[in-house]
């Protein structure tokens, strides 16, 4: 940790982020959210996307500062502009929930889909939820089944409920088609099976 402090003092954003993480989690130091935020902010000022995201999460969760989705979104957008998937998911979630900005389920769907294609499990779960529920999008239960199954494979346990509910809504033929597409996705990745996945009802 001494080496990280030396690098952090010299302005290294990754070292500053690492120290922030130690204080956030209480790893080898006393857990102090305000100190963690200070280090994350320094790293974020240095342009480190992971620090911008973690700072945004602390605002959203109200750790070290008053809970504020609006403030968190400032940092999520900075990290998202650098391509960070986790931050792009959080922006989509804010559109879905109407937290920190006006609710927009269409933009939420687009954000979840984009990051789900990249393999982000939480996005796959939320996309499956929207497709099963018909939440401002056309209900597609077979697609919901596959997306939920993909999320579950990655350990997103909430997706099991969606997968099982979707299975109850599709007949034997659609189930067979969904399982075939799922096997394609597992072997070739989501981008490799996307055309087949999009063709499912």
Q: Which residues fall in each region the model found?
A:
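Short helix-capping/linker turns of helical repeat alpha-solenoids
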Residues: 9-12, 25-27, 32, 45-49, ...
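Structural signature of tandem alpha-helical TPR/SEL1-like repeats
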Residues: 1-2, 30-42, 66-75, 102-111, ...
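Hydrophobic face of amphipathic alpha-helices that form TPR/SEL1-like repeat modules
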Residues: 18-25, 54-61, 88-97, 111, ...
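TPR/TPR-like alpha-solenoid repeats
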Residues: 22, 43, 58, 79, ...
């Amino acid at each position: 940790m001494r080496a990280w402090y030396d690098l952090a003092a010299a302005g290294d954003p990754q070292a500053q982020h690492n120290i922030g993480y130690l204080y956030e989690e209480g790893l080898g130091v006393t857990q102090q959210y305000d100190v963690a935020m200070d280090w994350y902010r320094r790293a974020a000022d240095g342009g480190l996307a992971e620090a911008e995201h973690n700072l945004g999460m602390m605002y959203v969760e109200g750790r070290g500062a008053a809970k504020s989705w609006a403030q968190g979104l400032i940092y999520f957008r900075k990290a998202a502009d650098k391509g960070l998937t986790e931050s792009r998911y959080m922006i989509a979630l804010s559109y879905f929930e109407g937290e920190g900005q006006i609710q927009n389920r269409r933009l939420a769907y687009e954000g979840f889909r984009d990051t789900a294609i990249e393999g982000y499990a939480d996005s796959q779960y939320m996309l499956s939820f929207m497709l099963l529920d018909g939440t401002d999008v056309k209900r597609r239960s077979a697609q919901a089944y596959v997306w939920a199954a993909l999320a579950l494979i990655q350990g997103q346990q909430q997706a099991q409920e969606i997968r099982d509910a979707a299975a109850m809504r599709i007949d034997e033929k659609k189930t067979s088609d969904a399982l075939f597409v799922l096997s394609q996705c597992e072997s070739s990745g989501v981008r490799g099976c996307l055309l087949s996945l999009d063709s499912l009802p």
